[in-house]
Amino acid sequence: MEASSLVAERPTGGEQDPGHARCAFYLPRKRRSCGMAPKAGARFCAEHQPGDSGTAARVPCPLDPRHTVAKAQLRSHLARCNRTKQDQALRAEREHMPWYEAGVNSAARPAAAAADEATLQAAVMRAIPVLAQIAEAEFRAPLRVAVLSNAQVEHVRFPQLPSNRKHALQQSSLIQHLREAGLWVAPERPVAYVEFGCGRGELSRYINQAAVLEQLERGGPAAPPAFVLVDRACPRMKFDSKFAEDVAELHARFCPSVPPDERPAPAVTRKKIDIRDLRLAALLSPGLEHIAVSKHLCGVATDLTLRCLAAGPRASLCGALIAMCCRHACNPAEYANPAYVEALLARHAPDMSYDLFFLALMKMASWAVSGRRPGVPDTEVGGHFSGLAIAERERLGHLARRLVDEGRRQYFADLGYDAELLVYCERDTSREDIALLVRRPA
């Protein structure tokens, strides 16, 4: 959208004082004016000059269309664009990154052909009775409901959140599951937690807090775990520096007799890398056991993570706890266990292709989490192409999610691990309430 069409969205009276050298363009999404400096005598910066202002024509930058550049200066801009510098820096770093290998965790399966909406809807209608038949034959036992709570998280985290505790409740349950499953650090058992799709590193931060506080409450010295944080993005307000600050604060509160210079800080390593390209073995310290964790690892990222763990040093992999989400964002070509789905189809619908059935599963999986407007009854159809009431669509959505998740569970079971799907939080806390718990057999 051109600047001239957006200037009108600026609230009345929201123009900058002429004495302030800031662009007068209002950014509706950020609810503030642009912070760039305009040229002398101009009201807007070069990025937000109206198209009819008589200034040189501007075009989106080919490297990053989020910003524009004067058309006449495009060639010189490409040489100095920040995106060019970032790409060059990343390429230079990769030459010294033994943990990077392009596509190492991708599946060898060819990509599924794209389906138009009519084809996809027809596949869904065909898949509905197949899914119901599979669920009746294969998934009659409900998943174990285990909504747990960690005392240390409640002690430290909950007082900071007087109102919205949804994320804290999920973190508390996941952390307690790690403890009860034996996937926990101790002074005599150092481990490294690898958080996939870590974002700001929030889950790892509270694992660190809970582990250190538990050790201090027992009167023993604190031995924080190590952390490896993996994400392809570089979010703002990361928690990386908070790990050491939390350890120091907990010592000061609960064990002040330990001198500050003797309070161990956790080793925290962050890598900006796509899980698709991650060679995990090159990131881990030799001889140190590791545990994979993630909260709401989205769609295909879960499948890439499972393959990454399977290809990594399994001798040191104690287990994993992954809260999954967004099955509608999966990919039939990248799914971790296509053989599992193909075997189900061979028994229940041998004439249906894997790719089309999986695309239908993705579509139906979204029905479980799309939510309802307040007051919508279970019997509401609302013109949906399936002709099914909303309650029935939600039920089928949960069955589709279950099938996708069962294949992931079986993937690790086939590798010799104890693997379980469980409900780790209440549905009104999060609709994405299923976690995959993997443990090395005793």
From Swiss-Prot:
Residues 1-21 are annotated as: Disordered. It catalyses: cytidine(4) in tRNA(Pro) + S-adenosyl-L-methionine = 2'-O-methylcytidine(4) in tRNA(Pro) + S-adenosyl-L-homocysteine + H(+); cytidine(4) in tRNA(Gly)(GCC) + S-adenosyl-L-methionine = 2'-O-methylcytidine(4) in tRNA(Gly)(GCC) + S-adenosyl-L-homocysteine + H(+); adenosine(4) in tRNA(His) + S-adenosyl-L-methionine = 2'-O-methyladenosine(4) in tRNA(His) + S-adenosyl-L-homocysteine + H(+). Belongs to the methyltransferase TRM13 family. GO terms for cellular component: cytoplasm; nucleolus. GO terms for molecular function: tRNA 2'-O-methyltransferase activity; tRNA methyltransferase activity; zinc ion binding. tRNA methylase which 2'-O-methylates cytidine(4) in tRNA(Pro) and tRNA(Gly)(GCC), and adenosine(4) in tRNA(His). The gene is TRM13. A zinc finger (CHHC U11-48K-type) spans 58-85. Keywords: Cytoplasm, Metal-binding, Methyltransferase, Nucleus, S-adenosyl-L-methionine, Transferase, tRNA processing, Zinc, Zinc-finger. It is found in: Cytoplasm; Nucleus, Nucleolus. The keyword Aminoacyl-tRNA synthetase does not apply. GO terms for biological process: tRNA methylation; tRNA nucleoside ribose methylation. Its EC number is 2.1.1.225. It comes from the Eukaryota. Zn(2+) binds at residues 61, 67, 77, 81. This is tRNA:m(4)X modification enzyme TRM13. It holds the Pfam family zf-U11-48K.
